[in-house]
Amino acid sequence: MKERQRWRPEEDAVLRAYVRQYGPREWHLVSQRMNVALDRDAKSCLERWKNYLRPGIKKGSLTEEEQRLVIRLQAKHGNKWKKIAAEVPGRTAKRLGKWWEVFKEKQQRELRDSRRPPPEPSPDERGRYEWLLENFAEKLVGERPQQAAAAPSPLLMAAPVLPPWLSSNAGPAAAAAAAVAHPPPRPPSPSVTLSLASAAVAPGPPAPAPWMPDRAAADAAPYGFPSPSQHGGAAPPGMAVVDGQALAELAECCRELEEGRRAWAAHRREAAWRLKRVEQQLEMEREMRRREVWEEFEAKMRTMRLEQAAAAERVERDHREKVAELRRDAQVKEEKMAEQWAAKHARVAKFVEQMGGCSRSWSSATDMNC
């Protein structure tokens, strides 16, 4: 479709020239007025101008302050991007909506990654001794399930195969080794009884049953371990007596320990993610509080300016009223003085007339006497 094609620089230049000459309106007349075959409809021209070519639009990614502002406004207004864009200068509603979709998808992906269990560690990561011990225990339990359940026979394991933290040459370890070498008829305790001992410290065991040498030799032959009967019923120097069921329990404990470690690692990652979210929320709240304080300060300043303007207007109004009152008083006084002056002038004129009448009558009287 033509509307989906990428805009070319010459088309943008045509739109800019059209807006400079005719203003951002009547987009359906662009081709007619500019005498250019612009294969774009009016809506496409409007969207191009409003979202990309309009002066004042910022290009590039959002800054951290703009991101915090958009997150706060989205929590306040929802997905009303036109209202949000009105409060974020230089950004359009379309740009903010796309940024929010990418931000939300990134958050969901981080949450899924934090809840996903960690991958299975390689033998190098788990450790050489742990890997050997676990594989040997699984092989032993898998090939001899019935023999381990009916009558567990003692096996001899070389001491170097065990990890260093299982090695011990103390007296209690020797007693534990003797107890493992001659278990009672009932199954052993669920707790792991595994230790190392030497032949010099461990006491000699009693005579084994008639069937024990042949069965022990047959059991130990497939794995390459010598049987106790080959050494007179006692463990050779540097060897440890290990019970098959105890070894399986040890492997199970190791697996449980590894599962606990993985769960702890997952919990730690989730806690770190939650802590990061809390820090972001606190930062947003601090920025919001700072903005609210600034807005409150600006509101107070505007109120003080309005009060100052109102007070100045009141003073000016009182001044105008007093000046008008003084002018009225002066005019009244002037009118009164004019009236008084007119009255005095009338009296003087009357007096002059009276004086003129008296002089005429006096002159006529004198003429008659003569």
Curated annotation (Swiss-Prot):
It is found in: Nucleus. Residues 1-53, 54-108 form the HTH myb-type domain. Residues 27-53, 81-104 bind DNA. Expressed in lateral organ promordia. Keywords: Coiled coil, DNA-binding, Nucleus, Repeat, Transcription, Transcription regulation. SUPFAM superfamilies: Homeodomain-like. PROSITE patterns: HTH_MYB. Residues 107-129 are annotated as: Disordered. Gene3D superfamilies: Homeodomain-like (1.10.10.60). One of its GO terms (biological process) is proximal/distal axis specification. It holds the Pfam family Myb_DNA-bind_6. GO terms for cellular component: condensed chromosome; nucleolus. GO terms for molecular function: protein homodimerization activity; transcription cis-regulatory region binding. SMART domains: SANT. Transcription factor required for normal cell differentiation. Interacts directly with asymmetric leaves 2 (AS2) to repress the knox homeobox genes. A C-terminal domain (245-347) is required for dimerization. Homodimer. Interacts with AS2, WRKY1, HIRA, a probable histone chaperone, and RIK, a predicted RNA binding protein. This is Protein rough sheath 2.
